[in-house]
Amino acid sequence: MDLRQFLMCLSLCTAFALSKPTEKKDRVHHEPQLSDKVHNDAQSFDYDHDAFLGAEEAKTFDQLTPEESKERLGKIVSKIDDDKDGFVTVDELKDWIKFAQKRWIYEDVERQWKGHDLNEDGLVSWEEYKNATYGYVLDDPDPDDGFNYKQMMVRDERRFKMADKDGDLIATKEEFTAFLHPEEYDYMKDIVVQETMEDIDKNADGFIDLEEYIGDMYSHDGNTDEPEWVKTEREQFVEFRDKNRDGKMDKEETKDWILPSDYDHAEAEARHLVYESDQNKDGKLTKEEIVDKYDLFVGSQATDFGEALVRHDEF
């Protein structure tokens, strides 16, 4: 068993051992918050800094001089200007904010990429992934470990094929990212729904009924009363999840549940930053306009609100 499989087994066993009957499993995929700060520019630009840079990177700018902040911001602007036309649009800024907020995903992909691109050709084939992930456990399975690795491999192969847009069974880094984090890609949402339904639909009728829905979240322990949140979830299923009132959720109803259409915080923040910085009101930003408003975007030791040191107690 390779390290990845060992860690997979360990995490699953640990989760099982530590789980409690009243714990709630959350299958809903929400967009992450841009910041846990209050968005009030009259008091501080902390929210904007977190949104533009990501919370961890924002802390590093709090320790820079204004000159250093402007220099680093200028380099960031060059990355945001995707088409290299000298302007930053709302869409380019929105894409950057989403990248900054999901940087951990790309870091995770980089870590896994190194372990799966076995021939180091800049691509990961299905054979490479299968051999790196399942090779040992399929050749020498442990009958006592409780995991059906063949079933897991079939499921992974189906997801890999879905992520692989050109159908050559060889993933680019973008396709590999879609494979590892399908909830982040519109074209992968159907596979997220399918896998979720397979996990919950115990009688394999292609639907999720009320008892399956509750059973996935809550394991009843003896004669104890149901927690209040379980009663609330029963009501949620009847009133909101099961839209056509047939007593079960189909694929579309399941999709609405686990992949809700959230308010686009990244787009709202991008529009806000453009509005505040667009001096000539042409609807897009030059590097000069952004750097002139560096205190809004990134801050420094000498911003309007003067944070000379990182405030460790806030994080």
UniProtKB/Swiss-Prot annotation:
Ca(2+) 1 binds at D81, D83, D85, E92. Ca(2+) 6 binds at D278, N280, D282, K284, E289. Ca(2+) 5 binds at D242, N244, D246, K248, E253. Ca(2+) 2 binds at D117, N119, D121, E128. Residues 68-103, 104-139, 151-186, 188-223, 229-264, 265-300 form the EF-hand domain. The modification Phosphotyrosine is found at Y47. Keywords: Acetylation, Calcium, Endoplasmic reticulum, Glycoprotein, Golgi apparatus, Membrane, Metal-binding, Phosphoprotein, Repeat, Sarcoplasmic reticulum, Secreted, Signal. Ca(2+) 4 binds at D201, N203, D205, E212. The modification Phosphothreonine is found at T65, T254. The modification Phosphoserine is found at S44, S69, S261, S277. A motif (Prevents secretion from ER) lies at residues 312-315. Disulfide bonds: none annotated. Residues 1-19 form the signal peptide. GO terms for cellular component: endoplasmic reticulum membrane; extracellular region; Golgi apparatus; melanosome; sarcoplasmic reticulum lumen. GO terms for molecular function: calcium ion binding. Its main location: endoplasmic reticulum. SUPFAM superfamilies: EF-hand. Glycans are attached at N131. Ca(2+) 3 binds at D164, D166, D168, E175. The modification N6-acetyllysine is found at K165. It is found in: Endoplasmic reticulum membrane; Golgi apparatus; Secreted; Melanosome. Involved in regulation of vitamin K-dependent carboxylation of multiple N-terminal glutamate residues. Seems to inhibit gamma-carboxylase GGCX. Binds 7 calcium ions with a low affinity. Interacts with GGCX. This is Calumenin. It comes from Pongo abelii. The lineage of its organism: Eukaryota, Metazoa, Chordata, Craniata, Vertebrata.
